[in-house]
Every structure is written in structure tokens, then in C-alpha cells.
Amino acid sequence: RFRHAAALLGALTAITLSHAADTETSPAKNAASADYIAGQQAVEAKQWKAAVDAFTRATLQDPKNADAWNMLGYSSRWAGDYKAAFAAYERALALDPHHRGAHSYRGVAYVRTNDLAKARAELATLDGLCGRDCEEYKLLAKAIAEHKPQ
């Protein structure tokens, strides 16, 4: 189970770091934010509270940054705060309804909270946005396939 979590974290981190260019939020804007960078570093180090704190500051500095909201959701989920995670994903998707990372991560959060119907709805959304070959779709499809009810 630990190896699976570590592999999933690695895949999520790779998607996260590569996804910024696919959204309406400018990667240059993210690069200029020391808090966003600190959040990314905390994610890479699996320091979830530090990541939540950094991405919270990043969203306060730039409330229209869908990537920062997405990463706040991601970090909150890993910290075990699903309520905060879902709220952050909602904000990211309100800003950018086509944000593949937010759809994928929210879908994984639905899997982790045993709401497979909503997870599958996110998967269908991703299929429409990027097809079945995009990393975000594959990640969520794998999480659904490997789900074991808790």
C-alpha cells in the first residue's frame, strides 16, 4: 500500500508540475510567486501542512490563480482535510472549468471518500476534455480501478 501511495504521489507531482501550462493561469505568474514555489517544494517533500500553508498564501495573493487553488486542494487532501480539499477544487474549477488537474484530483478525492459515482463523473469530464490518453484521465481511471471500499 505504501509503494502504491508513493507511486501515485510521484505521478501526481509530475502531472501537477507539467499541468500549469495547460491552464489559463500563466506559468510565469506562478513562477513569480515565492509562496507557490514553496508549496511545490513542500509537496515534493510530502510536507502537507507546509504545502497547505504556502498554497493558502498563494491564493490570498492571487485569488484568480486556478493552479494555486488546485494545489491547495491537492495538499489539503493529502493532509486529510477533504472538506478543505473539495472547497479548493471547487474554486479552481470555478476559475477554470477545463482545469484537468482539478478534475482529476477532485475525482481521486471522491474515490478516497468512497463516492465512486462522482469520481466516474469526473472521469467522464476528463474524457471529454482530453481523451483517455491524457495523464489526468489515466491517473483517475487507475485510482477508480484500484479502489477498495473502506
What is the predicted function of each stretch?
Residues A32, A66-D67, R100-G101, D133-C134:
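Helix-start (N-cap) detector for alpha-helical repeat units in TPR-like alpha-solenoids
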Residues Q61, L95, G128-R132:
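Structural marker of alpha-solenoid helical repeat scaffolds
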Residues M71, Y105, L139-A143:
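Canonical tetratricopeptide repeat
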Residues N30-Q61:
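Alpha-helical segment of the N-proximal tetratricopeptide repeat
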